[in-house]
UniProtKB/Swiss-Prot annotation:
Protein name: NAC domain-containing protein 72
Residue ranges crossing the lipid bilayer per the database entry: none
DNA-binding found in the keyword field: yes
Induction of its expression: Strongly induced by drought, high salinity and abscisic acid (ABA). Slightly up-regulated by cold treatment. Not induced by jasmonic acid.
Tissue expression summary: Expressed in leaves and in root pericycle and epidermis.
GO process terms (BP): regulation of DNA-templated transcription; regulation of leaf senescence
One cellular component (GO) term of this entry: nucleus
Pfam family of the protein (one): NAM
Length: 297
């Protein structure tokens, strides 16, 4: 299977994470109806191909868009020139219908039919069943414009390969290499973009962010946190007046406690089972005052 030189996603200039997952109704109304009416698509994601001239495993490389499922507009080949039965012979095998047809409606009106088919390798009726599946969408009679015989000439097909549980474990070296390259490329790109975003943040120089790391509230409640480690911290600088920004009272509470200490109104209990500790923080880079936290055992 040939390798495409250019990435269709890059050429379409789509935002990261964008995927093409249309509903059955959208495929019929927004794409097939417009195709048979001669509408020009500004964003071409479904290509034209004579699907029955190829084996299904050759189709992904011919698609304009898609990763695990691929979409095509295909002429509807008939078995007999004046008949209505379609010709299902394709490449080295044939497509065989499975299940029952599904009527697709839009606003309560029947607009088309969805048919499921499975590809068999070899000649009918003794072909070997494969995991290649096709959903064929076609318009029904009253969806066609009067006097237009070309509306039945096109069908829209979705092609994909069904993966069984046993085959998920059996990955060929080529597939593994391709998946690893895709995963690493995506991860590297995402990591690079994250670094760019983080580098764009302003540097916050505030000593109050140098508090020792507390893994959980349980560490504090169990009395295992070393409050003595806070003694080595430099005093928190006084905040400059903020221009019209709201104050949440956290820093004021810290200053009030500091004033009480200077006046001798704060009594320290050294040998009690209870522990009260207050500390404040501020982030002047964002203009937000800190908060006062109190933990009791």
């Amino acid at each position: 299977m040939g390798v495409r030189e250019k990435d269709p996603l890059a050429q379409l200039s789509l935002p990261p994470g964008f995927r093409f997952y249309p509903t059955d109704e959208e495929l019929l109304v927004q794409y097939l109806c417009r195709k048979v009416a001669g509408y020009h698509f500004s964003l071409q994601v479904i290509g034209d191909i004579d699907l029955y001239k190829f084996d299904p495993w050759d189709l992904p490389s011919k698609a304009l868009f898609g990763e695990k499922e691929w979409y095509f507009f295909s002429p509807r080949d008939r078995k007999y020139p004046n008949g209505s039965r379609p010709n299902r012979v394709a490449g080295s095998g044939y497509w065989k219908a499975t299940g029952t047809d599904k009527i697709i409606t839009a606003d309560g009106r029947r607009v088309g039919i969805k048919k499921a088919l499975v590809f068999y390798a070899g000649k009918a009726p003794k072909g070997t069943k494969t995991n290649w599946i096709m959903h064929e969408y076609r318009l029904i009679e009253h969806s066609r414009s009067h006097g237009s015989s070309k509306l039945d000439d096109w069908v829209l097909c979705r092609i994909y390969k069904k993966t069984s549980g046993s085959q998920r474990q059996a990955v060929t070296p080529v597939q593994a290499c391709r998946e690893e390259h895709s995963t690493n490329g995506s991860s590297s790109s995402s990591s690079s973009q994250l670094d760019d975003v983080l580098d764009s943040f302003p540097e916050i120089k505030d000593q109050s962010f140098n508090l020792p790391r507390m893994n959980s509230l349980r560490t504090i409640l169990n009395g295992n946190f070393d409050w003595a480690s806070l003694a080595g911290l430099n005093p928190i600088p006084e905040l400059a007046p903020t221009n019209g920004l709201p104050s949440y009272g956290g820093y004021d509470a810290f200053r009030a406690a500091e004033g009480e200490a200077e006046s001798g109104h704060v009594n320290r209990q050294q040998n009690s089972s209870g522990l009260t500790q207050s500390f404040g923080y501020s982030s002047s880079g964002f203009g937000v005052s800190g908060q006062t936290f109190e933990f009791r055992q």
